[in-house]
A protein has these predicted regions:
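Low-complexity, acidic Ser/Thr/Pro/Gly-rich terminal tails and inter-domain linkers that flank the onset
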Residues: 42-77
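Short beta-strand elements
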Residues: 160-173
Length: 173
């Protein structure tokens, strides 16, 4: 066999070896980039107002990088309506009541009524770092898990809520 044919087969074997060494990690990387791991929200049994109930609990940051806890649950105090509790860190703010929560999604806008004073535990809490809102109207008016923006006058100007959280809220209703 001529020498040039032997050299050619050696080069093609090297190319095949390098091809698989480079191609396999590259294909794995591309599959992770274009098919990201899904983030699933969780509904857990939580103690709220002294009772165990299913609730969605998420920590989100507003555009000022302040962290807020959003707890959504069906309240036995409010005729089993879906309630959204917004909790800030005590000492950082004071939420005056009643204050409606503005919710925006695209061109649509909702104002959720403040239900904080109906909850005796929150009404008597001196820290005043939490507020509760009637989420039923919003959940009944949306048919998709769309991203939302929450605004609470004097507290935060915009708190983005991702679609997976909205999906979790809708599953509670």
């Amino acid at each position: 066999m001529p020498l040039w044919i032997l050299k050619m087969t050696k080069i093609t074997k090297l190319n095949k070896k390098n091809f698989f060494i480079v191609l396999l990690p590259l294909s794995i990387l591309l599959s992770l980039v274009f098919n990201p791991i899904k983030v699933n929200a969780e509904i857990a049994e939580t103690e709220i107002n002294g009772e165990l109930m299913n609730a969605s609990i998420e920590f989100l940051r507003d555009l000022d990088f302040e962290t807020w806890q959003l707890v959504t649950y069906k309240s036995p105090l409010a005729e089993d309506k879906l309630i959204l509790r917004v909790i800030g860190y005590p000492g950082n703010l004071r939420i005056d009541h009643p204050t409606n929560l503005q919710v925006d999604s695209g061109r649509k806008r909702w104002f959720l009524s403040d239900k904080t004073l109906l909850n005796v535990d929150l009404a008597n809490d001196r820290r005043q770092a939490a507020a509760e809102f009637d989420l039923d109207e919003l959940i009944n008016n949306i048919d998709k898990n769309r991203p939302l923006r929450l605004s609470l006058s004097g507290v935060f100007s915009e708190l983005p809520v991702p679609p997976f959280v909205v999906k979790e809220w809708r599953s509670l209703s």
